[in-house]
A protein has these predicted regions:
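Acidic, aromatic-enriched beta-alpha/helix-loop junctions
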Residues: 58-106
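N-terminal secretory signal peptides
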Residues: 1-75
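Generic structural motif
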Residues: 44-46, 59, 86-88, 136, ...
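Intrinsically disordered, low-complexity segments enriched in small/polar residues
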Residues: 10, 30, 77-80, 85, ...
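Low-complexity intrinsically disordered segments
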Residues: 90-169
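Short, well-ordered strand-loop elements centered on a beta-strand within folded domains, enriched
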Residues: 48-56, 65-79, 131-132, 141-155
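Hydrophobic side chains in beta-strands
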Residues: 43, 56, 85, 121, ...
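Compositionally biased, intrinsically disordered low-complexity regions
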Residues: 14, 34, 53, 82-84, ...
Length: 169
């Protein structure tokens, strides 16, 4: 295993947001004889929810498979998501409480039209914050593994909602 660094595009932030990324990046070679698929596990923080650690796992195809399929600019667009608390979980007053949630980040999985996304949903009644990972693609015909129908969730109990936490854009 080795540490790797990747750039995630956090919504509302123009930089690579290194302050939200943790140093617990892992890259593991999995299936394949010589050129193997790579399982990546990354840890990151939600900038609007203190005390939560999110873990995202996804796969990267080897360059030989990309060349053989003639699709060198894309990777699978499905991921696993887990979360844990690292202390008191506090939801910022600026976090959206709308039913459609708020996008935490989006990562491009091809040159154009395909991305892996994580959204946050605040459940004030259930005193929880829920995260969902899903893929988004423009061309629904080229989806051989039905990744557009796959998602993953995790939830963490909230200790405090900061006052003024109204529906924000």
């Amino acid at each position: 295993m080795q540490r790797v660094s990747r750039s995630l595009n956090y919504i509302g932030h123009s930089s690579t947001c290194a302050q939200y990324l943790r140093d617990a990046f892992v890259q593991v070679q999995t299936s394949g004889l010589v050129f193997k698929d790579t399982l990546r596990v990354e840890a990151f923080d939600d900038p609007k929810v203190a005390g939560v650690q999110l873990y995202l796992s996804d796969f990267q195809r080897p360059v030989t498979e990309k060349l053989a399929k003639g699709d060198v600019f894309s990777d699978p667009s499905q991921g696993g998501l887990g979360c844990s608390y690292r202390g008191k979980v506090v939801v910022s007053a600026t976090a959206s409480t709308k039913p459609d949630g708020e996008q935490v980040f989006s990562e491009s999985r091809s040159l154009i039209f395909k991305s892996l996304n994580v959204r946050r949903f605040v459940d004030k009644e259930g005193e929880s914050v829920v995260y969902a990972v899903y893929s988004q693609r423009l061309d629904k015909n080229e989806d051989s593994n039905n990744s557009r129908f796959k998602s993953n969730l995790c939830a963490v109990h909230v200790d405090e909602f900061q006052s003024g936490a109204a529906a924000a854009p």
